[in-house]
Amino acid sequence: EDNCKLKFLELKKRIFRFIIFRIDGQQVVVEKLGNPQETYDDFTASLPADECRYAVFDFDFTTNENCQKSKIFFIAWSPDSSRVRMKMVYASSKDRFKRELDGIQVELQATDPSEMSFDIIKSRAL
């Protein structure tokens, strides 16, 4: 998980827009890194339709007072079509893994894309 922490620190420095993590055997590994130009749509398109993942996304937005801000989201992606055993593994490991990533501001759990739409992300950020 050291590499996960390292990449997360780089995301906080705005080197990456997002990171997708997967559980490989007993450990969490980095599966994909999104460059700063990538959008939220690029990010959601990178999540598999039928497998669980953890992800962090650095969300830039404008407040109602017209201030530019960003918030780091932790997303637990657990689609309905994924295997029950994997859902349980991801659910039981989530809090421990999330604690390793210092600086997460918003947590979101999603079982289908509508639960993590751009509008939902924006409303949770404000």
From Swiss-Prot:
Pfam families found in the cross-reference section: Cofilin_ADF
Database matches in InterPro entries: ADF-H (IPR002108), ADF-H/Gelsolin-like_dom_sf (IPR029006), ADF/Cofilin (IPR017904)
Keywords attached to this entry: Actin-binding
Keyword Translocase applies: no
Gene Ontology molecular function: actin binding
A cellular component term, taken from the record's GO annotations: actin cytoskeleton
Entry annotated with the keyword Membrane: no
Cited SUPFAM superfamilies: Actin depolymerizing proteins
Alphabetical list of Gene3D superfamilies matching this protein: Severin
PANTHER family the record matches: COFILIN-RELATED (PTHR11913)
Function: Actin-depolymerizing protein. Severs actin filaments (F-actin) and binds to actin monomers.
Name this polypeptide is given: Actin-depolymerizing factor
Naturally occurring in which organism (per UniProt): Brassica napus (Rape)
